[in-house]
């Protein structure tokens, strides 16, 4: 047997396709910070596992769940689609308008426009601001996060999302405490321990009926060192609300896809991204508030699941299914 002197160089086996690499690019520097500072930041147990699910390697996420959640990181030299540097969030501020989060539950299309159902049962009847833009042709209700423009136009921008991000945002709006940390709390704590702070969230563009958003981070003590992340709007808005930073919308998107309220209501229910105050609506007189009951069931189910009380969560789930079936028969 012969002995070969010299260093052993491991051979890297490239994946069969480059789809995962191109579909889920993530900054190497940010990954190194996450792994090298794991112990220094104290990200152990549930916090670390949640962080891995959020910033995990594409192959790992793909193998476990069958889908990839792309997280794109860019630094000062990148572009966010409008020609301005992605991390320089002050460069194109005139193209964006501040917005506030409303306590909306779902969006439904009707024959003469749209209906936004609020958390406490109020219905806002709306029409499209730009009639030439066609969208949401089906009449089925969709869970939605609704942003209100703060430029005096009072336009509403509904963003259709999954049920969980919508419920998590409503829980944050109502200051409902969840015992176990959510992924949004983990991201907030992780960025702070890494020396960064969330500064801004922007809804930048709409491509094939899907909104794109960016989350802007700045180095604490050095505002010129910035990072921008491409996230789903539902996640970016949840993080922005918990970090108490402005949520801005591209003016073109707000004009083309925004809705105008045509039915006046006694009062409005929204949370300002600057002042974070809200006006609580009165419940309908002598009428059951089905939305509030449904919200309580969903909240109890999620809290039980987070606390690993799976038997209780299953009971709340069955109650929720029965409640929704009963409400559907009443319509």
From Swiss-Prot:
Record bears the keyword Nucleus: yes
Coiled-coil features, chain-numbered ranges: none
Subcellular location: Nucleus
EC code: 3.1.-.-
One of the Pfam families matching this protein, by short name: BFN_dom
Induction, as annotated: Up-regulated by wounding, insect and fungal treatments, abscisic acid, etephon, salicylic acid and methyl jasmonate.
Gene Ontology annotations for the cellular component aspect, listed alphabetically: nucleus; VCB complex
Role, per record: Bifunctional nuclease with both RNase and DNase activities. Involved in basal defense response. Participates in abscisic acid-derived callose deposition following infection by a necrotrophic pathogen.
The protein's name in its UniProt record: Bifunctional nuclease
Gene coding for it: BBD
